[in-house]
């Protein structure tokens, strides 16, 4: 098992199929939430060396994303105190008229409002991108199977991405996660944040490659709020080439 801390309130735990098998679990066990699944999650948390801010943090939510050869579990802690007070419960209305499902939906919404909303939004963005990838892959397979739908299109050779960071420390931490080849990278300073551009070579890659890479990038960054053209004209240029490589050399305290 591997664990990464995505933000102050979100962890990503990668569990291999072998790990699942050793614990008597299968992918189908995660299709319908049940007590067995919850016990598995907490047993995994007990085994890992959790960051201090996750220990005894109260309420946790788990989001499961099955992969071909593993299971990705995103764990988000709530900023709500471990003991929910009566004022919190009063916000839910008449609980006697709620089904258990409605109650937990209301509770989850309350957690989102009082917890790390940005982390939830980022996870949803990643999930939407991956859903688009699956749909595009199925569409391509369908077109390949039906010659009448084939048509010539000009493939992209390179794709530029723009990412935002609140602090330079976040940009350095992001750079250290890059373990794949990139063609170029730049760093700009905006009025209230830092912006990084990433250029990827997508030649000889499948059509969904660009979306998959974008999903990987925003695991540790925020989607860009400016275009590269805007930054070139209005941004303060800090590193015009090799920004990722230069930031990787910086040691974080």
From Swiss-Prot:
PANTHER family: ADAPTER PROTEIN MECA, ADAPTER PROTEIN MECA 1. This is Adapter protein MecA. The N-terminal domain probably binds unfolded/aggregated proteins; the C-terminal domain interacts with ClpC. One of its GO terms (molecular function) is protein-macromolecule adaptor activity. Enables the recognition and targeting of unfolded and aggregated proteins to the ClpC protease or to other proteins involved in proteolysis. Homodimer. Belongs to the MecA family. NCBIfam families: PRK02315.1-4 (NF002643).
């Amino acid at each position: 098992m591997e664990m990464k801390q995505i933000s102050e309130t979100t962890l990503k735990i990668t569990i291999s199929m072998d790990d699942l098998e050793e614990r008597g679990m299968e992918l189908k066990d995660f299709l319908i939430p049940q007590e067995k699944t919850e016990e598995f999650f907490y047993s995994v948390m007990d085994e890992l060396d959790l960051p201090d801010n996750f220990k005894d943090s109260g309420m946790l939510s788990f989001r499961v994303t099955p992969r071909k050869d593993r299971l990705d579990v995103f764990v988000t802690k709530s900023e709500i105190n471990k003991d929910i007070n009566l004022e919190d419960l009063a916000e839910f209305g008449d609980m006697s008229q709620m089904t258990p499902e409605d109650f937990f939906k209301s509770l989850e919404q309350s957690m989102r409002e009082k917890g790390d909303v940005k982390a939830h939004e980022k996870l949803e963005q990643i999930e939407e991108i991956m859903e688009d990838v699956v749909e595009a892959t199925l569409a391509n397979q369908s077109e390949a199977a039906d010659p009448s739908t084939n048509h010539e299109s000009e493939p992209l050779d390179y794709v530029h991405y723009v990412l935002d960071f609140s602090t330079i420390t976040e940009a350095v931490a992001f750079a250290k996660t890059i373990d794949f080849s990139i063609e170029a990278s730049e760093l700009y300073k905006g009025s209230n944040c830092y912006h990084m551009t990433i250029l990827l070579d997508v030649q000889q890659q499948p059509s969904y490659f660009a979306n998959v890479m974008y999903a990987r990038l925003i695991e540790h960054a925020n989607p860009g709020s400016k275009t590269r053209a805007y930054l070139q004209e209005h941004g303060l240029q800090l590193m015009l080439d090799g920004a990722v490589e230069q930031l990787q050399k910086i040691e974080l305290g």
